């Protein structure tokens, strides 16, 4: 009886092993889906995509990885992969070469000069590069069994997920528009963050961008030793960024800003809807000034006095808000209905993007910190189409500042420096321009506490805000440009051996009849063929006869374009070749 039981148990074990051998491939896919399900929020729907494991493995082993990228250099490149893999043991991505592999661009060793692409939107930062290791697909036979990710993946780095300015400027805005750059990606993609940070203080904001829970690099190790993405996009669009942080040259606005307030406000509208924040605005007579209160450093020492003075000057109530004491949804709700936002310089001012049109931003700077040298929020507020007023106030009184030399270096302490350097910093009246990120004089000054000089602040605000601050309904402010003028032609007449006239005429751009434009002018460039210079004219009518310096029997080149409201310059029509 005992031997029979043992024999039966062994037989069951053998049969189980045989069955396992036949089903193990499908269970690899099931395992991944179970792991991903654990990472989802309770409200997240089940995945629409499932992996046929044997088929996926066959495609990878025979065909290999496929890559096609957009962008000419590593700083503006986004790549689309099929069957890109990631080794959790080596912590590197793998491109498997198979029979149908494609690698565009095929850079050879230039792929390492310095990288294929930037994983974050901070341009050309040597901690943010993406690359992969190459292997023949046949190497898969000697590697751990791959686990296939069923979701479309967007793979990127967050730059600094604990700082709200970096979260919005470097991550959320670029993620939002990268997801919309490719059809369907916003509704299908799962975000994979590979920089190695933990969730950070604002992880809930990243969750708003996709219906699927984002995954961190550390979580990938629980899914398998070798992960393979059936479909992945790698990199982020930098087109929405407006500021550079001073890694190569002192910080300031980007040289070529490509985003306007229109795109910022569409993103802000999306975020407020996801946060369930109302757009109704405040009733007439209940407008308020919102003051950001900091609780740990860079304090406003006379905050109560400031609140009272603002209320008296502008005849509206004042409200305080802080990131520490309010949910982010409450912060957005208060900012999006405020008439004026007042704050010390700091990451919380990125919430300026939620202010209503016509509102005012007042940024306060501690002693010795020049507002002209630190302008991420000014640049944001002044983007075309944001329609905000911006005010910068600087404490000019050393007696109104409280310093903290005894703190750790990263909170502005300077006691670790030699005495001569400490003395120099204490006597300095302005922090000189500097690179990011550990300049001790900058850290010492930016972490000061400030007693705001109320009269000088009110005077500074009043230079910009003449009446009662507050949101206002505005007409479309983003400039619409004219098209080309149409049917441009020229006619010449000669009077004697030395006198000639050249008449140029054209029709209005066809889109003008659909627009309400305050002022329409035309710019005409006149150039004698063979000369290097031209003569420009600004004209109000659609035709003009030129007589000055017009020579008989001469060829002239003529360009004409339309201008709206003095600043919106349309394209030149095709060049006219006119013979007198």
From Swiss-Prot:
Cellular compartments annotated: Endoplasmic reticulum membrane
CDD domains: FN3
Keywords for this protein: Congenital muscular dystrophy, Disease variant, Dystroglycanopathy, Endoplasmic reticulum, Glycoprotein, Glycosyltransferase, Limb-girdle muscular dystrophy, Lissencephaly, Membrane, Signal-anchor, Transferase, Transmembrane, Transmembrane helix
Fibronectin type-III domain residues: 488-580
Glycan attachment positions: 99, 276
EC number: 2.4.1.312
Similarity comment: family membership: Belongs to the glycosyltransferase 61 family.
Spans within the Cytoplasmic topological domain: 1-4
Superkingdom classification of source: Eukaryota
Molecular function GO labels: acetylglucosaminyltransferase activity; protein O-acetylglucosaminyltransferase activity
Positions in coiled-coil regions: none
Entry-linked SUPFAM superfamilies: Fibronectin type III (SSF49265)
Enzyme class: transferase
Gene: POMGNT2
Reactions catalysed: 3-O-(alpha-D-mannosyl)-L-threonyl-[protein] + UDP-N-acetyl-alpha-D-glucosamine = 3-O-(N-acetyl-beta-D-glucosaminyl-(1->4)-alpha-D-mannosyl)-L-threonyl-[protein] + UDP + H(+)
Stretches that traverse the bilayer: 5-25
Record-linked PROSITE patterns: FN3
Species of provenance: Homo sapiens
Biochemical pathway: Protein modification; protein glycosylation
Full protein name: Protein O-linked-mannose beta-1,4-N-acetylglucosaminyltransferase 2
